[in-house]
Structure formats: C-alpha cells, structure tokens
C-alpha cells in the first residue's frame, strides 16, 4: 500500500464519491479509481460498492478507512519530527475557532511560546465540525474552540478538556432603537446585524442564535473579523453578537450598550481537544496542562499581541459582504 493509494481511498470515504475525491486531490476520476483498484487487488476485498443511496462499505473497507487516516497521520507526524530534529526546533500546530483565534489565541501563543526558545506555533482557523477530522488525521496537534462530545465524539480517541467559560451578548451603539428596554422580536429582525466570521459557520453558536431570533439573511452582514463588525456598529449603527469580555471596555466607556432579552445572550465554553495523552507529542501535553492556569487565562482574556518570530499563521480566506 502506498501513501497515494491510502490518501485517495481516505478521500473517497470522507467525501462519499470518487469524483469529489478526485476534485479535492487534483486527480482525474480514473486516477482515483486506479488507486482504489490497486488496494482492492492487494487486500483481496472490494472495499465498497455503489448503491442508489451512495457508497456501501464492506467491513474490511471500513477498517481500512480508519487505518488509512492513522497511517497517513503518522507519516505526516514522522516527517515533521524528522525536520524538527534536523533544525533543532519544534512546531505546534493549533486549529481554532474564529472567535478564539481573534480574541484569546494571541495572548495564549505569546505566553506559551515564551516558555521555550525552540518552539514555533502555527495557527489555522477551522469550523469546530472539522476538529475531529483534523486531529485524527494529525493535520493539527491540538484544536481549541466551543467543542463538545457531541461534535468531537466520545469513543475515547479524542481527549477533550474545557478551560474557559464566556458569554455571547448582543450589543448596539448608544443611539440605537434597541438600546432602551427589551426589544420586540420584530424590531430585532428589522435591524442590520454586523457580524464576525463566526456567523458564517452554519452549526456555530452565532448562527444558532441568529436562527433562534429569526434574523433574515438579508439583514446580516458578515465581516472579516469581530473587530470590524464592532467598528461598523459604532460607525453606522445596527447590532452585533460579541464575546462579553472582548467588549467589556467599550461597554464600561459607554461606546456600546448591552441589549438584554430572550435569545440575546448565550453561555459558551472553550475546550481543548487532542489525541489521547499516550499518542500526542510532549508540547501538546504541556499546553493542555498550561492552558487552564490562572496566568494563562489572564493572558488570553485581554490578548497582548503575538511576537512575529513565534507565530506562523496559516493562510485562510474569509468571505464577507
């Protein structure tokens, strides 16, 4: 079995079709089918068959699917460790929700990376629905965001630890019609909602709140950051959903007003997710133990910026209107 064969088969399993796998891998349909055929011949197992409802996998095909993810992950991890050993540096890859990446990751990365001169941190932003896949495939070492056992799974392969509670609140400018009293649902639906990138995640907390409030999509504008959405609210009006501690200073200074009422607040909790302790690298275990300490919590809440020599951001694109 070759990595190319396993990569093609893993993509077919994850995406549910040869065509989708080919598009993701940049191969032709025939190329993916060739890799699958080679695996079928070597293992003497059909692996899957096509049905009217999609692909139906044999027991052996399902076993290969889980093993393929593990093997490819170990291959990638080994390559990283060899490179680290050659250059005398360690790399910690963090996947984070957009809200955590904007509001808490800077302070965390600066403080944690300052503990070791040989450590570089790479941060990428992903929806929490991808956390399990990213961890199991070893595409990242650790994932941080509003994860839960329902989204990550409770089969023991993923370690999950909550570490910081927060509130999502509704805020407006002081001159907004929502600033006084408890607003009626119709008035909420009539407002322009200036939203950060978290609103673009269909299964995220912000999207859930917006659905609960029945805010029409035509009244939602999504910006590249929560800070940009807040700036627009203070400049032209409208409402936004924000992490409570991130807007505490603006609320205290009177630049924003907290709007209360049914569905306008939501409690959340950030969690750290990794492979089981026996399978993760030492730097991950260090971060898991460090992230819930009072010193680290204090660093994450205000956010103190990131030293550019320590932080390697991955390129990602956010679309906004």
UniProtKB/Swiss-Prot annotation:
Swiss-Prot/TrEMBL GO biological process terms: regulation of DNA-templated transcription
UniProtKB keywords: DNA-binding, Transcription, Transcription regulation
Domain HTH lysR-type: 1-58
Keyword DNA-binding: yes
MF annotations from Gene Ontology: DNA-binding transcription factor activity; transcription cis-regulatory region binding
The entry's DNA-binding region: 18-37
Transcription is among the record's keywords: yes
Family matches, as Pfam families: HTH_1, LysR_substrate
Domain of life per record: Bacteria
InterPro entries linked to this entry: LysR_subst-bd, Tscrpt_reg_HTH_LysR, WH-like_DNA-bd_sf, WH_DNA-bd_sf
Protein family: Belongs to the LysR transcriptional regulatory family.
Protein name as annotated: Uncharacterized HTH-type transcriptional regulator Rv0377
UniProt organism field: Mycobacterium tuberculosis (strain ATCC 25618 / H37Rv)
């Amino acid at each position: 079995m070759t990595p190319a064969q396993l990569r093609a088969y893993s993509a077919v399993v994850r995406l549910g079709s040869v065509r989708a796998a080919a598009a993701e891998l940049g191969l032709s349909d025939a190329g993916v089918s060739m890799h699958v055929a080679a695996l079928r011949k070597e293992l003497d197992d059909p692996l899957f068959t096509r049905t009217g409802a999609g692909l139906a996998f044999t027991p052996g095909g399902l076993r290969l699917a889980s093993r393929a993810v593990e093997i490819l992950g170990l291959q990638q991890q080994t390559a990283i460790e060899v490179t680290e050993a050659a250059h005398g540096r360690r790399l910690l890859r963090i996947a984070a929700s957009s809200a955590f990446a904007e509001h808490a990751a800077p302070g965390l990365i600066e403080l944690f990376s300052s503990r070791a001169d040989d450590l570089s941190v790479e941060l990428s932003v992903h929806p929490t629905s991808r956390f399990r896949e990213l961890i199991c495939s070893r595409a990242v070492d650790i994932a941080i965001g509003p994860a839960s056992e329902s989204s990550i799974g409770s089969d023991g392969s993923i370690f999950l630890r909550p570490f910081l509670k927060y509130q999502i609140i509704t805020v407006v400018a002081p001159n907004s019609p929502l600033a006084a009293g408890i607003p009626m649902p119709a008035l909420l639906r009539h407002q322009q909602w200036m939203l950060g990138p978290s609103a673009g995640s269909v299964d995220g907390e912000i999207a859930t709140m917006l659905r609960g409030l029945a805010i029409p999509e035509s009244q939602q504008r999504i910006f590249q950051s929560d800070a940009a959405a807040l700036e627009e609210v203070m400049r032209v009006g409208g409402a936004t959903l924000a992490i409570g501690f991130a807007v505490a200073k603006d609320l205290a200074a009177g630049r924003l007003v907290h709007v209360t009422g049914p569905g306008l607040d939501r409690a959340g909790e950030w969690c750290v997710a990794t492979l089981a302790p026996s399978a993760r690298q030492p730097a991950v275990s260090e971060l898991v133990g460090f992230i819930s300490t009072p010193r680290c919590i204090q660093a994450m809440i205000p956010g103190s910026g990131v030293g550019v020599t320590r932080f390697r951001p991955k390129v990602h694109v956010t679309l906004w209107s």
